[in-house]
Amino acid sequence: MDFSLVKELREKTGVGLVKCKEALLEAKGDLEEAIVVLRKAGALSAAKRSDRITGEGYIGLAENESGLALVELNCETDFVAKTATFTEFANRLAQVTLEGRVSSVEELSQLSFPESSAISIEGERSSLVQKTGENIQIRRVLFFPKKAGHSYGVYPHLGNRAVGVVALLCSGQERLAKELAVHVVAFAPKFLSEKDVPQDILRQERDIGLCQAKEKPQAIAEKIAEGKVRDFLAQVCFLHQRSMSEPKLSVSEWIKREEKQTNASISVASFFCWRLLGE
């Protein structure tokens, strides 16, 4: 198959590459006939919807002993986003991502569900567009491998509009990891600790403090600037934030208390939060 023909058909119709290739194969390389094939399949009407805004959706989630997978599936309305057909499709996408350790939307789109191997996932997506009458797009995918000696916590929130994930460097701490994942969703930390914050950001916060205290004596202004930086770190750093479960303790202090109670060494290996339409 001449890829330039596939590309030309894609540019003319707006239909995905996989569907274009299938249409050209059926049309034996005839471009105009391939367009007719796409029209008969309803793919063109689906493509016409592809420029409509997708401001709703659902984050599909799948997990096993080797890893976890997330897939953000977008649609136009919350009505469709809450339907079983839509959420099940997102979770099936996540399961394929998990089993295949998929790393991109493009790779996922060319795969198939095990129960319908004759149809690509891109074809299934187009069918769902036809069924719902909405623009439906796979926005992003992630496969997150698990490591030995770690504990993992996953927390889906607000109908899977947000999913928090925490990995702890310590086995047998799934409960704590889950509680910390809830915290990540609620407080949205950007960094693990002070050492992870870029120096230019810290300097900027300090300069803001000095500017706000410019009428004060230098020694007092310096203390105000230091306080400004501490407050900033308490807002954006995971370990510096107040614990959601124990507000009197920072997350770091909370983890240390768990270490004493379990006689284990616990540290945060990684964390992240996916939010619908987020980065």
Where is each model-derived feature located?
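N-terminal assembly/interaction segments in proteins that build large macromolecular machines
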Residues: 1-279
